[in-house]
């Protein structure tokens, strides 16, 4: 996957290129990330990248000319078919379904705003989609861009050691993930559930599915409203609720 990022702080993206799953993907050639800094496209000796908004008010906007030139440079490098995304609190909220959709694109250009945002005409003429990571205020689009890159890259074939890792992640099937355990078998008197030590793969599968359903019901019940549960899932969830009520 090819990724281009428009940012005033390209150094921040070393967190993506140098560390963890994404860093390994870059090293292995599965992920290619380039940055364009609007400061490199300025024409004054101060490298000015902000400007006053028409109509007054607090704060500044990103200056149009350097930003637009940076986007054009990224588009030229990406070639035909690249999708331009602006990280914005007004955008569609990123969820696993959205991540899956974005992962279908082989080339993405991410525009990271700063200050009070960017000129609306840039959004109208240069941006294909706006995406948000949540209803809260951040200082810029870099952290949302890194969040998007991390989540999307996990779905690129070969990035994870095992594809099952992505398939079993929380939200991959609309449910929260089940609890996980490692050694020791007993920790401060709390034992690993016996079924996980049984070696019975079908029973382990059913337990994990039931725990995912139950955890989703308890922590994010609204997610279940969007799912068409199978007969197996419905039965497992009913058993979970029955057991929970029994010991309540």
From Swiss-Prot:
The gene is trmD. GO terms for cellular component: cytosol. Its EC number is 2.1.1.228. GO terms for molecular function: tRNA (guanine(37)-N1)-methyltransferase activity. This is tRNA (guanine-N(1)-)-methyltransferase. One of its GO terms (biological process) is tRNA N1-guanine methylation. Specifically methylates guanosine-37 in various tRNAs. It catalyses: guanosine(37) in tRNA + S-adenosyl-L-methionine = N(1)-methylguanosine(37) in tRNA + S-adenosyl-L-homocysteine + H(+).
